């Protein structure tokens, strides 16, 4: 689950991480009032969407598609500039490297006080699933695309792994700060800030907290100038306040409906729909589709206890994507029974008048019953012996990749 920058800043502030004063706004008038309230010589006018790269993005009119303004984050030195930038941002489409060509409609602004900047850093806390730890990434190259830094100058990125049993140790914070060239007051400020940021990460069940840039001021203070925060939705039951932080307008309507039906769905840019049980198997299925020249249109995990109605809903959601030219069903029955999936597939195919190629691979619990149900139907369903066979068949049936 993602939240906006202004929400992330409030979370950081609540947990003792230094941030600048700012105001969340939804209208131009609110932005002007925020400027007056902040009483700062310079302010940042920041578009708020659930995507990175806002500063380097472009804003377009929704109707005509004409360019409105370059950059979704602007520095304003006057009330008039705040008005101009706010008018150009609110209600328009922001396209960034992370939004895709369709972009996102900007409904929220964050007006933030400015500060002097002596140096910009990159800092992020992430879940490292391979090492079963929290990974801290930091670089002296803040304010830039970290992917670009990693590609061109990987030696400038510093990584440390934190054992969740012992937590962040003081020497780790010190070593990281020194690796970034900090000393004296700035090093102490960094160590204090990082300890609070780590505690926030753990206590709020975050999967990512990214600050780009983290800045050192002329007074050697350390301040979070940006924030990107994501939560682990599996921990939602522990955090009742997450409902208040969720911005449904930033989420795909079809993904919301999928969640309400007990399905995990993420739309992608390909043309082969995927219906799979289990997140790991779903990702493996997408990988194998790409291996054989296809492009997955979605990630869809029906879970371990799906019923016929959920399978039907899953098909309906997949087929809402006009780019889908074929569907691959890949089920490994453990808790899930293959006969239930087979009946759901048939019910969905009949109810939705399926007119795209369908390949079904079944394995595991009640697999023989499931295969028999599919074989006895008069529907045009292509069985597959294994995942590789299924991926090759669906790619061939749709005439190749995208």
Regions found by a protein language model. Name each.
Residues 1-211, 215-329, 339-341, 350, ...:
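ATP-dependent carboxylate/acyl-activation modules
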Residues 346-347:
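Short amphipathic alpha-helix used as the core "switch/output" element in two-component signaling
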Residues 355-364:
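Short internal beta-strands
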Residues 332-336:
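Glycine-rich, proline-tolerant flexible connector loops at the mouths of alpha/beta enzymes
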